[in-house]
UniProtKB/Swiss-Prot annotation:
InterPro entries: ACT-like_dom_sf, MgtC/SapB/SrpB/YhiD_fam, MgtC_SapB_SrpB_YhiD_N. It comes from Haemophilus influenzae (strain ATCC 51907 / DSM 11121 / KW20 / Rd). The keyword Cell inner membrane applies. The keyword Ligase does not apply. This is Uncharacterized protein HI_0647. It comes from the Bacteria. Its main location: membrane.
């Protein structure tokens, strides 16, 4: 009975309740981040992120309390209260490196999962140090970033896949290259890419890719190029 009462007294000690609440917060926030990875069937899920967050949280608490304890024992002892936390950040990198894969086609995968591991450690440290608001806001922002990134990527991809207009132009000689490109630039055509190929007959073939233009501008561009001295033929692919 005495042991049980001592245990209950220790559990309901205000200081111990604060420690428990910090570790519980770290576990919850780590699990929330890990759940996103779990739903995507990634190797790092709820359990891993929760373990990382709780462990870094308790190490941070120990680091801070140890610094305070030994400072009271002797005035000659001074330690950095966040020393253990700093070592955790360094060591967690090795765990993150284990999930990064370099495939045969030079593609690299696992970077987001590695970042999640590092983020879980950071949130655990924040919770352990008592920065509750920071830990919660960081978790929310991480989840929002993960959810929004596919939408942003699709939007950027659509923008990058805008239609292009390709001109395949055959000119008499190299001097006509500058005339043709300058003609397009002067008429507000945005050139994206130019490729020059010498022909066996001494002529030069230009392949010019411009950002997509409407049908009216396309007709004008075709007419301008056909009328230019030195231009033998013009092909347009829109």
């Amino acid at each position: 009975m005495e042991n049980s009462s001592l245990l209950l007294t220790a559990l309901f000690n205000p200081d111990h309740l604060i420690i428990f609440s910090k570790m519980l917060l770290a576990m919850v926030l780590g699990s929330v981040i890990g759940l996103e990875r779990e739903l995507k069937r990634k190797p790092v899920g709820v359990k891993t992120c929760a373990i990382i967050a709780v462990t870094t949280c308790v190490l941070t608490i120990v680091s801070i309390q140890a610094a305070e304890h030994y400072a009271q024992v002797s005035e000659n002892i001074r330690t950095d209260p966040m020393r253990l936390a700093a070592q955790v950040i360094s060591g967690i990198g090795f765990l993150g490196a284990g999930v990064i894969l370099h495939k045969k086609n030079d593609a690299i995968s696992g970077l987001t999962t590695a970042a999640i591991i590092w983020a879980s450690a950071g949130i655990g440290i924040a919770a352990g140090a008592g920065f509750v608001f920071d830990a919660v806001i960081a978790t929310v922002m991480i989840l929002v970033s993960i959810r929004l990134s596919p939408l942003v990527q699709r939007w950027v991809h659509r923008k990058s896949q805008r239609r292009r207009t390709k001109f395949n132009i055959l000119v008499n000689d190299a001097e006509s290259i500058g005339k043709v490109t300058q003609l397009l630039v002067n008429n507000q055509y945005r050139i994206e890419h130019i490729q020059v190929k010498d022909q066996s007959s001494g002529e030069v073939r230009l392949q010019i890719r411009c950002f997509s233009i409407d049908s009216t501008m396309l007709k004008d561009a075709y007419a301008l190029l056909k009328a230019e001295d030195g231009v033998i033929s013009v092909e347009v692919d829109n």
